[in-house]
Amino acid sequence: LAIQSAADINKPEKIFFHYEFEPQGEWWEKAKPLLTLNKVKAPESFMGRPLYHVAHKADVVRLQVLKETGGIYLDLDTICVKPLHGLLNNSFIIGQELKPEYVPKNWRQEIKFAIRKKTGLIKSNQVNGLCNAALLSEKNSPFVNLWLDTYSSFRSKGRDKYWNEHSVFVPIKLAAGHPDKVTLLGPYAFHYPLYNKPGL
């Protein structure tokens, strides 16, 4: 569904699927004709720092590919509901991620949050960070280069307290220091509903 929605809504010339191990199964066989496959070797380390978890290896691969080619990166669970063409004139785009406690749990909160969404009144203390599940980038974007350079301080060993440091917190710090190199979209642009129980 995610791949089909990306194809139908955005109508790209090609959809590149970067992988180390090719998926299998009925749904993969249905999606495969939509894709241009690109087999990669996931890095064991980057900038002299070991990458222990597959998610962190994937984080580095997506940034390296965007640096080399530019384009749109979407996680495999991203469902496109609107085309992204209108955003392609920016050097780099990333969306904010709400803290899980700010996901509406009932209809009253949904109305309240809808009003905030329309008026742009999302408070900064409600934003968890930036999320790398959907990224748009020009080739060799200055922001991608800055982000990749921060991996010299990468320290996560897996699902530890540094798990999302480089995927969520580092980019928001970079964006604060280099607002001219990045376009930030609100939390409802790419990352809603959230990954918590009510969102799922």
Q: Where are the regions a protein language model picked out?
A:
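Glycosyltransferase-associated regions of secretory-pathway enzymes
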Residues: 1-58, 76-200
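Small-residue hinge/turn detector
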Residues: 59-71
